[in-house]
A protein has these predicted regions:
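Tryptophan (W) side chains
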Residues: 2-5, 23
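Charge-dense, helix-prone N-terminal extensions
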Residues: 15-156
Length: 156
């Protein structure tokens, strides 16, 4: 299958360049690999860096492609994810407005907050680690938002 071949070929090249990289990570699921492979190189590098830091900081989280983008969940509740926008990669924390952190901007009408990146150099590892810790500790119940007819309740 073409996707399998493309993943293997790209992985060979990426493995060579990542061996010495700060962002080197464990193998990712094939659907997330395919998501990264569909991006231009610069955006793929940003997503690789985010993937690595998120999986290291939240090893207990389940992650998968959800609504066509990589998303991490704790006990079924979406916590963090990223996706390609027209001019950047957006990192989204579902409960991020409650973190009260500089560098995260309000997104939408619920509790989400975002950071946007156009280069991997813009990712501040210390800020990201702090935000990821808060994403575990501060959560709004998005898992049951439909059941509660759009009303969010704090779970942590």
């Amino acid at each position: 299958d073409w996707t399998e071949w493309l993943i293997k070929e790209r992985q060979k090249n990426l493995d060579k360049s990542r061996k010495s990289s700060l962002w080197y990570h464990q193998p990712m699921q094939k659907d997330i690999q395919a998501y990264h492979l569909a991006l231009v190189k610069e955006d793929s590098v940003i997503c690789d860096a985010l993937f690595t830091q998120i999986t290291r900081a939240l090893p207990e989280a389940e992650y998968k492609i959800w609504h066509r983008h990589p998303v991490w969940f704790l006990e079924g509740n979406p916590i963090v994810g990223y996706h390609k926008l027209k001019d950047c990669v957006r990192l989204l924390f579902w409960s991020g407005q409650s973190f009260e952190e500089k560098g995260l901007d309000k997104e939408g009408s619920f509790k989400a907050a975002e950071a946007r990146y156009t280069s991997v150099k813009e990712i501040d590892a210390k800020d990201l680690a702090r935000w990821l810790k808060k994403s575990r500790d501060i959560q709004w119940d998005y898992k049951n938002i439909v059941k509660r007819k759009g009303k969010l309740e704090r779970v942590k």
